[in-house]
Amino acid sequence: MSDQATTLRIKPLGDRILVKREEEEATARGGIILPDTAKKKQDRAEVLVLGTGKRTDDGTLLPFEVQVGDIILMDKYAGQEITIDDEEYVILQSSEIMAVLK
């Protein structure tokens, strides 16, 4: 678990995953500083905390396909956005992850 995740004291349930979106650059190519309202939601995020996993109908626990620290690709509008200590995070289901970036 990352240091940041340890201080959050949050544990997603089931097949949910806590991620933090990558920060959008605050400066445009021409050197213009972009206000928060002009920034786009990022579709890349770092996996911070994994839930307990998904269980099949027979009770088998399925392993996650991602690990803490992975950088993932997700839909910009996936999951539930939450704020903890003035930081933005997203809780999403493992099925909402499209890819792991290597």
From Swiss-Prot:
Keywords: Chaperone, Cytoplasm. GO terms for molecular function: ATP binding; metal ion binding; protein folding chaperone; protein-folding chaperone binding; unfolded protein binding. It comes from Chlamydia pneumoniae (Chlamydophila pneumoniae). The keyword Secreted does not apply. It is found in: Cytoplasm. NCBIfam families: PRK00364.2-2, PRK00364.2-4. One of its GO terms (cellular component) is cytoplasm. This is Co-chaperonin GroES. Together with the chaperonin GroEL, plays an essential role in assisting protein folding. The GroEL-GroES system forms a nano-cage that allows encapsulation of the non-native substrate proteins and provides a physical environment optimized to promote and accelerate protein folding. GroES binds to the apical surface of the GroEL ring, thereby capping the opening of the GroEL channel. Gene3D superfamilies: GroES chaperonin. Transmembrane segments: none annotated.
